[in-house]
Each structure stands twice: as C-alpha cells, then as structure tokens.
C-alpha cells in the first residue's frame, strides 16, 4: 500500500482569535497593542475567530472591502512565524511519506510500523487560547492533526503500553514555560531582607499578577526585548538579573529542542536506510550453515581500472573447490553390505546379498570397509524389501 500526501491548503495558521472586549466595545488597547484581533465590519468572524488575509501578509491585497483580516505588524510577525513552521511540518510529512513508501516497496510483506508521537501540550482542539494565541509559540505536538489529540494532557512515550499521567505532563509543560517566575514567599509575608535586584525570586508590585495555582507571575516578553510601551502592564517587568535568568532558560530550551529534533531525524533516516540493506552472504543464499562453508573472501583491489594486472586469487579457488566437494557429498550414499530384510523369502535374500565385487568402485574393498555405491547404481538396481 503506497503512502502519499496530497498538498492541502491549510488556513489554521492564518486564524486569529478575536478580542472579546473589542466585540463588547470595552477594549482599552488599540489594535497595534492588543494580542487579539480587532477585525473591521467587513471581516468575516466565525466562532470568535477570524482568518488573516494572505495577500495582506505579502503586501499585495487590492480588495476594497476584504473579508479577511489585515493584521497589525505584531500579529503579522507572529503569523509569518506560524507559516514557516507550517511549511516545515508539511515538508517533514512529505519526507516521511516517501521513506515509508520506499520501505514498503522494498519489503511488500512487512506491515507499516506507526511512528511514535510525542505530545507535551494539552489538546489544541479544545483549548482555543492555546491554539490561536499569537504570543504563545507555535507548539507542534506531532504530525497528528489537532482534532484527534486527546482531550486530557498526556505524554506519549516510545512504549505505547506505558502512558505518563497528566500530572507528569503538567510538570513537563511547566518546565517548558520560560516566561514565568516564582514569587518570593518571604516578600509576600513582608519578611524578605533581600532587595528586588538581589533576590532570585520575583517581587511583583501588584498582587493581581500572581497566579494563585503555582504562585508564579508571567513575565512581559516585550519588556525584555525593550519594546513594552504600555502605561500599566499586567505582566511582570523583571530586573536585570532575572532577565538574564530567563534568557538563559530560553537558550537551554531551544538547544534541547534542536538537539532532539536532529536526533529524531537522524534516527528516522538511519532506520529507513538500515531496513533497506542486508549483508550479502553466499552461505545464506545457498542454504548452507555458516560453520560448514566460510563466507566468500573479498577480492583485492586492482591496480588498474581495466583489470589488466588482476592477480589470481586463491580464496576464490578454495571457495569453488569447497562448493564442488559439497555437491559430491550430496550425490553419494552409503549402504551396508548386507541389508536388513524382514520376512523376506530365501530368493529375495540371495538376490539382496550380492557379492561386493560386482558393485562398481568396490573391487578393492576389504571386509572391514563399507563399499561406496553411487546414485546411478542405486537407481538402476532396485532392492525389494518386505516389511
């Protein structure tokens, strides 16, 4: 069964979530600062989401009343990143399909093995904010569509029989979040002797920033990049030493993700190449045990490409001689001089006990030697045995 991937235009990476406060008319942020979309009246909104105009990203939209969103610069940058990731994902799927098709063509009887998928995020199909939030990185759990992902967070390991519980998945997701800092508990009690610039934990000025579930605050990434222009930002602005800590954590996560992606690609390529190759052994092809006949020795390299100075290889001659000996041994048979005949008549026994001198190749046989009877003699002289 051939595996093929049909290129389908996917608009999910162009989808943005519409600001609910903007729909109510209460959003205080302009469209150039809000992390959600502020569509115009001509835009088509479905289920609180809007599709961005692809021509607008390329700067070539000439429609007067375009039904697609023309995103502001900060959302346009995020959409371009999502588009590149989507293109890389499609290329990986096409490459994987070609490898599976080639392996299946070389081994028709072998079933296609499923590719292990690793998912460390909740279901994108049920979490709209995670699926369409432009400030969250485009997390690609695997090559599986979002509609068939599990509804509960789950880590799928290489062994499908051993799933990781949701608590471990949440812990892994927490470790991957590099935009959060733990709040100093001593600062919350008013007992922290270290200042804001010396403490390794966050000292937020506003208690509404603190997430009560894990006692953390979300860091303003725009402030770290030096471009936060909000008068009253709801995210934490960390001091210099905590900014360095966040940048180091982001660097480690990116390096680990790149190393894991390279290792996965190398393992897939190596497994595909290994499955298409096998060592050529003459003893395996002839059905002869390895101990009986040694493998064919390698031919020494020639001095010239035309083979004019080829040297006689004694290994080839020994190999051919061993094959000839094996064929001679298979065509010969051994028979006792006096066959055991149960319940035979005297005439039959006398016919069976023929003199050994009448047997070909046994004229010089002594009483202690077993005569060798050829296969042609066995076919021409039939011995009758009664059971």
Swiss-Prot record:
Q: Name one molecular function that GO assigns to this entry.
A: zinc ion binding
Cellular localisation: Nucleus; Cytoplasm; Cytoplasmic granule
GO-annotated cellular components: cytoplasm; cytoplasmic stress granule; nucleoplasm; nucleus
Q: Which domain of life is it from?
A: Eukaryota
Q: Which SMART domains match?
A: ZnF_C3H1 (SM00356)
What keywords appear on the UniProt entry?
A: Cytoplasm, Metal-binding, Nucleus, Phosphoprotein, Repeat, Zinc, Zinc-finger
Query: What InterPro entries is this protein classified in?
Result: Znf-CCCH_Muscleblind-like, Znf_CCCH
Q: In its UniProt entry, what is this protein called? A: Muscleblind-like protein 1
Originating organism: Rattus norvegicus (Rat)
Gene name of this polypeptide = Mbnl1
């Amino acid at each position: 069964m051939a595996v093929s991937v049909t290129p389908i235009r996917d608009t999910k990476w162009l989808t943005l979530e519409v600001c609910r406060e903007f729909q109510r008319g209460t959003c205080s942020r302009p469209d150039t600062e809000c992390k959600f979309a502020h569509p115009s009246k001509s835009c088509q909104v479905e289920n609180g989401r809007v599709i961005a105009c692809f021509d607008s990203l390329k700067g070539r939209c000439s429609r007067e009343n375009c039904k697609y969103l023309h995103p502001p610069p900060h959302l346009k940058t995020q959409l371009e990143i999502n588009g590149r990731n989507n293109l890389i994902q499609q290329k990986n799927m096409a490459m994987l399909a070609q490898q599976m098709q080639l392996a299946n063509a070389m081994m028709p009887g072998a079933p296609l093995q499923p590719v292990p998928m690793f998912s460390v995020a909740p279901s994108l199909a049920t979490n709209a904010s995670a699926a369409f939030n432009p400030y969250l990185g485009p997390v690609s759990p695997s090559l599986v569509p979002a509609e068939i992902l599990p509804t509960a967070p789950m880590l799928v390991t290489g062994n499908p029989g051993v799933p990781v519980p949701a608590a471990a998945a949440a812990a892994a997701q927490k470790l991957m979040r590099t935009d959060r800092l733990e709040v100093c508990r001593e600062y919350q009690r008013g007992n922290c002797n270290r200042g804001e610039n010396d403490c390794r934990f966050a000292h937020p000025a506003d208690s509404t920033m603190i997430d009560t579930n894990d006692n953390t605050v979300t860091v303003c990434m725009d402030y770290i990049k030096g471009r936060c222009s909000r008068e009253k930002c709801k995210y934490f602005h960390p001091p210099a030493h905590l900014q360095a800590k966040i940048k180091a954590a982001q660097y480690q996560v990116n390096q680990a993700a790149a190393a894991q992606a390279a290792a996965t690609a190398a393992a897939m390529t190596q497994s595909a190449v290994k499955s298409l190759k096998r060592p050529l052994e003459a003893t395996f092809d002839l059905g002869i045990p390895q101990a009986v006949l040694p493998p064919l020795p390698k031919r020494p390299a020639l001095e010239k490409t035309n083979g004019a100075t080829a040297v006689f290889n004694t290994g080839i001659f020994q190999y051919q001689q061993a094959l000839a000996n094996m064929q001679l041994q298979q065509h010969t048979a051994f028979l006792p001089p006096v066959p055991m005949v149960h319940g035979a008549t005297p005439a039959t026994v006398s016919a069976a006990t023929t003199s050994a001198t009448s047997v070909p190749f046994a004229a010089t046989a002594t009483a202690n030697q077993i005569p060798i009877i050829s296969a042609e003699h066995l076919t021409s002289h039939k011995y009758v045995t009664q059971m």
